[in-house]
Amino acid sequence: MVATVSSTSLLEQPELLERRLQEIPQEPGVYFMGDRQGEILYIGKAKKLRTRVRSYFRDSQPHTARIALMVQQVAEIEFIVTDTEAEALALEANLIKQHQPHFNVLLKDDKKYPYVCITWSETYPRIFITRKRRLNQAKDRYYGPYVDSFSLRQTLRLIQRIFPLRQRRQPLFKHRPCLNYDIGRCPGVCQELITPEDYRQTLQKVAMVFQGRTQELHQLLTQQMEKAAADLKFEQAALIRDQINSLGKLNADQKVSLPQDTISRDAIAVASDGQISAIQLFQIRAGRLVGRLGFFADGVESELEKGEVLQRVLEQHYQQVEAVEIPSEVILPCALPDGELLNDWLTSQRGRKVTFNLPQRQTKAELLEMVERNAQYELERLQKQTAKNVTALEDLAEILNLETLPKRIEGYDISHIQGSNAVASQVVFIDGVPAQQYYRHYKIKNPSIKVGHSDDFASLAEVIIRRFQSSVKGKKNQQDWPDLIMIDGGKGQLSAVVKVLKKMDLLDKFTVVSLAKQREEIFLPGESQPLPTHAEQPGVQLLRRLRDEAHRFAVSFHRQQRLSKSRRSRLDEIPGLGFSRQKQLLAHFRSLDYIREASVKQLQEVPGIGPQLAQTIYDYFHPVNS
């Protein structure tokens, strides 16, 4: 990487700009545009770095208003040379995700659309619907994000009827399978009545459904049925026949888009209001719509920006799928800025030609029009939800007599059972929407709170101190401070928080209220009576959603702590087994029962557990006189 820095914009220094451009090689790679403060403004990729970077500073080159504004601020150019264009594409995506440059088109991290996850990292993988991708398990596979969550759940339920799959995260019984095994919904994973290899073969067939390869799966099952019949395994053949028939019902529910078509294709379109863009990606395989994916991104105002958004979506999507899921054709509403590079990369990944098509024929144009209509419907739905949130924030600002809308609202709640395992939650709403990346848990450490005696007031005071003390001491900036704090409770809980905020000289920095559960009453500091509101007001409903989310988050964490403590209580009695090794044991075996049943050899498979400690653990659960 080469860094070139100027105290002013490079546009103001043509000779210096030309020297900088000459330093950049004509090789594939990634380039960075930075301002005079060293902040990264834009990250891009190119087959020929110098040619691409030079194009930004040519008057004849058409630019969007956003890029034109960015170019005026560029005082620094950096680059990383890669061996191939494909490496440049992958590196660019990772760097944009890491740095979030202001002038790049950024996809919104939306939790609204669900994924299907298959946990290939586990010995017996599970399949389930989730709205959050786990980044720490590289082997796990995600399909989506799907727009229609109802249809997705119906599909998964039907699949679980067709193929016997693992249903539970933890076994229900110790020495026998549960009812799911008896009714044929599970192959008895908990008792290892099926080998991991055979189970994974079944799950590979399920994965083919979400890869859009149902026709290929139908052919595979037909071959297996015929082979079973030829081998006189008639019961197995009948079971596969039933699977084929059920699979036909699954396909029957899918919309026919291009009859008699055998080509795999994706069609993508975008609708934007200038503030946000809704993108729809339709996956069509053998003439049937097998997947409808949705994304959100920054707003666009021109065809050039539309192409940038679509390019970013396609790059992110195809980098996360397997080669068999890449279609032979992608239907586009407009040209992509780096379409040739993306096309070459997709072709190399797939192993066969991938075509980008701006449709001229009526059938494909009608298909693209259908995708565009769905993108527009999704944008309108999002606009209505945004308007609803704005109405709630405006109503809340009026109730609390705030000068501006509360952009960031934090809610706090305490959870415990008679003072034991006391924990607190901090949840955050931004623009009226939950922002889970800012949620926090707190374990209450106050030594004055004894087991068997609860003290919500002291617990809340401790949490508020821990939340803001770093910012007060100057160790953290104050950009993440809330506009409004809501406490779950009544006047007592509010008074405890107000008291500690006064000590920290923070009471005038933001508004603090409490929301009592029984009548949804809002209390302000120093007021003996609640504010005159009614429960159906949009602002009150917003606070109630915040309060309920804080309560849910606190109770969930408290339940985890109780479970963890109950698991560790017996392990604490084993000499030489510290806390970190206890965690490794539980992570490996998943339950205390499995640790108890493990052999010395199996115990030694856990990192950090040597032969002597493994024998000690085994002897603890298997005393000689038992």
Swiss-Prot record:
Keywords: Cytoplasm, DNA damage, DNA excision, DNA repair, Excision nuclease. PROSITE patterns: GIY_YIG, UVR, UVRC. The keyword Lipid metabolism does not apply. Residues 26-105 form the GIY-YIG domain. Signal peptide: none annotated. Belongs to the UvrC family. Interacts with UvrB in an incision complex. This is UvrABC system protein C. It comes from Synechocystis sp. (strain ATCC 27184 / PCC 6803 / Kazusa). The gene is uvrC.
